[in-house]
């Protein structure tokens, strides 16, 4: 029996209190928004104090994200010191999968290992790199990274997540086609901007890497001319999904496993898909763009599913949990679920909880509960 406070994610932040002493074990704060906004930070601190005031006894631990610079991490460390308890850092994608498990009673009290597919825009990995296209073996409070999407460069850092054309340029560079960056993007973003990004990629200047599925969606949307700069979060991914849906309403699509490869260390490489499908379509042919968007969705889903199935067999696991904001995408989710179920695996998804960052705190608390109980 324990009481765990979890401070939640950086984006779409919400905190929760997990109290296993009472039947209704989870109490949630309101959603505060993104912690880049000082008002959200103030709201989080107020909510946490309210949760602590409502608890029926002393807390046992405080969970937070692995990132050391988040306000939520600083708050957790301070509160842990004040209450004389442990502050427990939980990796972002581990927490996404744990949030799913926390909602499934079969995995409470006596958790069994699962394969987790965690897909989103960003989360700090244990290696210091930005993750987000992960296949994990999760065993309660512990996890092992058993696969991930091949990394893409973020030219300019975080700004690349707001400008899909930059991710498209990074994809061209990754495919050995950097010479196409300037002629392809100068007409839409200007020659100077296109040349600057080309130079940054060639020289690896301010070009961190990420395995995030969200950035692969951005790259695909940018390559197909569906999005240059985003006005709101996931705008490019939504446009890509809409294009795919238009095609799939009236067409069947055959996916080829030659459009991806898996390296011995579990890196899922979808560059063959870019070369065969996304780089060549005529932006001015809507039908070709829609077909390419559909092929991207189904191929990415099949590549991730195939590796998850292989890992489930290797580790003798029969459950696969899906977490992260990319699973708001219906085409991706339906395809992954159908592939996993066709292989005889049991698929776990969030039920009443958001699959995105708004539900992350429950996963943090669930992992911390396992660590605190050891």
Task: Give the ranges of each region predicted by the language model.
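Conserved phosphate-binding catalytic cores of ATP/NTP-utilizing and phosphoryl-transfer enzymes
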Residues: 1-2, 89-116
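A contiguous, well-structured pocket-lining segment that forms one wall/lid of small-molecule binding clefts
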Residues: 11-42, 46, 176-200, 204-317, ...
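Acidic, glycine/GT-rich loop-and beta-edge segments that sit at the periphery of enzyme/chaperone cores
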Residues: 180-184, 365-374
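Glycine-rich phosphate-binding loop of actin/hexokinase-like ATP-binding domains
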Residues: 113-173, 194-247
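Conserved phosphate-binding/catalytic loops in two-lobed NTP-binding clefts
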Residues: 65, 83-96, 319-323, 330, ...
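Short glycine-rich phosphate-binding loop at a beta-alpha junction
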Residues: 56-69, 315-326
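Short Gly/Thr/Asp-enriched flexible loops that form oxyanion-binding sites at enzyme active sites
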Residues: 68-83, 122, 126-138, 330-338
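Short glycine-aspartate micro-motif
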Residues: 3-6, 63, 114-118, 210, ...
């Amino acid at each position: 029996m324990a009481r765990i406070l979890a401070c939640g994610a950086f984006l779409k932040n919400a905190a929760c209190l997990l109290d296993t002493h009472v039947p209704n074990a989870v109490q949630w704060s309101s959603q505060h928004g993104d912690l880049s906004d000082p008002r959200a930070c103030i709201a989080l601190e107020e909510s946490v104090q309210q949760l602590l005031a409502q608890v029926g006894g002393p807390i046992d631990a405080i969970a937070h994200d692995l990132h050391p610079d988040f306000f939520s991490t600083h708050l957790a460390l301070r509160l842990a010191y004040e209450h004389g308890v442990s502050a427990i850092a939980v990796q972002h994608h581990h927490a996404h999968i744990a949030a799913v498990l926390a909602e499934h009673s079969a995995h409470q009290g006596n958790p069994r290992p699962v394969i987790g597919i965690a897909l989103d825009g960003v989360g700090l990995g244990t290696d210091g790199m930005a993750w987000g296209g992960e296949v994990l073996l999760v065993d309660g409070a512990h996890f092992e990274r058993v696969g991930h999407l091949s990394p893409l460069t973020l030219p300019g850092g975080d700004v690349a997540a707001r400008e899909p054309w930059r991710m498209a340029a990074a994809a061209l560079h990754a495919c050995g086609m950097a010479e196409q960056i300037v002629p392809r993007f100068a007409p839409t973003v200007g020659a100077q901007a296109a040349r600057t990004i080309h130079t940054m990629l060639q020289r690896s200047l301010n070009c961190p890497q990420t395995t995030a599925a969200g950035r692969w969606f951005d790259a695909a949307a940018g390559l197909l001319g569906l999005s240059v700069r985003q006005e709101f979060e996931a705008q490019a991914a939504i446009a890509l999904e809409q294009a795919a849906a238009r095609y799939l309403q009236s067409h069947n699509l055959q996916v080829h496993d030659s459009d991806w490869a898996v390296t011995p260390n579990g890196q899922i490489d979808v560059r063959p898909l870019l070369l065969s499908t996304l780089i060549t379509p005529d932006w001015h042919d809507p039908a070709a763009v829609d077909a390419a968007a559909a092929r991207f969705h189904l191929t990415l889903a099949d590549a991730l599913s195939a590796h998850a199935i292989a890992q489930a067999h290797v580790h003798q696991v029969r459950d696969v949990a899906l977490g992260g904001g990319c699973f708001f995408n219906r085409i991706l989710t339906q395809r992954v679920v159908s592939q996993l179920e066709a292989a005889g695996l049991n698929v776990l998804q969030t039920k009443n909880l958001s699959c995105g960052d708004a539900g992350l705190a429950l996963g943090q608390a669930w992992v911390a509960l396992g660590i605190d109980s050891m």
